Amino acid sequence: MKILLVHNRYRSTAPSGENRVVDQEREALATLGHDVRLFERQSDEIEEWPAWKKATLPARVIWNPTTKRDLSVELREFQPDVVHVHNTFPVLSPSVLYACRDAGVPVVITLHNYKLLCASGDFYREGSVCHDCAGGNPLPAVRNSCYRGSKLATATTVLNTRSHRRTWQNLVSAYLFISESQRTLLAGMDFDADRSFVRYNYVPYDGPVIDPAAKDPRRQVTYVGRLDAAKGAPLLMKGWDAYRAIAGDDALQLAIAGGGPMLDEVTAWAADRPSVQLRGMLGKPDIFSLIGESRAVVLPSEWEETFGLVVVEAMAVGVPLLASAHGSFRELVTDGVDGALFDPGRPDELAKLLLDVDACPDKYVDLGRNARTTYETTHDPQSNLQQLLDVYRFAVANPVPSR
């Protein structure tokens, strides 16, 4: 099958799981013998634009004639069987869907976030989950300057999604949601249910797995991810302090891998706490290695995650999760089976779980064994890719009519 992936990469200063998913799937599909190409643009390129071109960005977000023209050329030359769109914001724009329509090529789109209904893409505002725009009315987003703290930037983002609502509904042959909880929260888009599918993100792993029979010397838990409020950095710090206040000095260690807007705050906090180690930004092999050194992985997200690559990465290694009990985490992690869930509004609940992790190592070895089983049964890479190919075949067999 000839497959063209279309993706607008996020800024290099804000590493994205979406970028990783695109790269991993491209490599895997090519390994299976498919002819795969990637049509992409970089958000970083905006910084290099001349002033006059930057001034046109609000209009280009909504309709970029240059990318439509360039993609049309690629479609004529490559003649793919299917186009798989990931992200079109901000450089590509929904104009790419019209290029595909004009070329008569069916489109599959993966919805990685909540951007079509939420200007910030995460249903999170001022430290709390927010569903004010979930019904389809975007005015609260503009009123609250939800995108980059700017009413103008928010209005541009909202205008893009609202003006192309029928584009998303009429020019896409198949929609891929990355969790059932995400599909539920995006119900306000009124997508055709017959063309909507849930497919978890692809996470390949062929490295070492924790040996449940081995003695468990690990007295460490790990956080891997972006350091910001939505990802739960404040909750992590409060929960850790509450735990150490009870446990004292002879207790677990905390390893933190990642960067982000709260890096300086987390660094200052960790400086006074010998039990906390900052590992910085790590590549994928080092992330898996760090997870393997841990008794559990902590996921304290305060926003309702659409997925969570770290969940599956930990399961692949055989390490259980301590995760916030909302969003996709309630779907991915089964409390008491392959991890434990806690109220994201309760740092004391996280502290109690950390006490349990240290006091009951055998229990968490068992949870880790179950986590690995979950990976093998629910997140098997080959089954995941087969599901993706089935959706491609569906799109080819059921193209939307030109309108």
Regions found by a protein language model. Give the residues of each.
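Acidic donor-binding loop of glycosyltransferase active sites
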Residues: 292-306, 319
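Carbohydrate-associated surface elements
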Residues: 181, 202
